[in-house]
Amino acid sequence: MGSVRVEDFELVNVEVPDLKEEGDFLVRNIWMSVDPFLRIYMTKGTKHAPPFELNKSLEGGCIGKVIESKSSKFKVGDYVKANFGWRKYWIGKETQSEEKSISKVNSTLGPLRSFLGLLGITGITAYVGLFKICNL
């Protein structure tokens, strides 16, 4: 297994394709999550998901802003949270919203980065563990 090293990663520039279909929208990532569970997917994966593929972008939580849209659900200027991970831009489709956990973020509730921590799955996990299981 070994430790993850800088040499294990590569920064690659790719062309961002044009939006082709109704329901497509282009997002520029602002925040990306680096969670401990990602380490599992760098080796063997789990019963819930296969390991990361070599020479592909790492998947994981991200917060971004819709900068172009052919979607009635996700409009230019909307902030969204998804599992598209480590990339500067990504194209989402309305039909992927459940599969890739794409959802709008209400930026008035707190700093955007909070939706990957305190207001995200890690915050919910901590809350349930402390207050529902440990009864604190």
What are these regions (language model features)?
Residues V12-V34, M42-W86:
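Glycine-rich beta-strand-centered segment in the early N-terminal region that forms part
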Residues M1-S3, G45, R113-S114:
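Extended, compositionally biased low-complexity polar/Lys-Gly-rich tracts
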Residues M1-G2, E53, D78, V105:
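Intrinsically disordered, low-complexity boundary segments flanking structured domains
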Residues G2-E15:
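Short glycine/threonine/proline-enriched tight-turn/helix- or strand-capping micro-motif at secondary-structure
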Residues R39:
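Beta-strand acidic-aromatic groove motif in beta-rich domains, primarily in extracellular
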Residues L58-K65, V76-L136:
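NAD(P)H dinucleotide-binding glycine-rich loop of Rossmann-like/cofactor-binding domains
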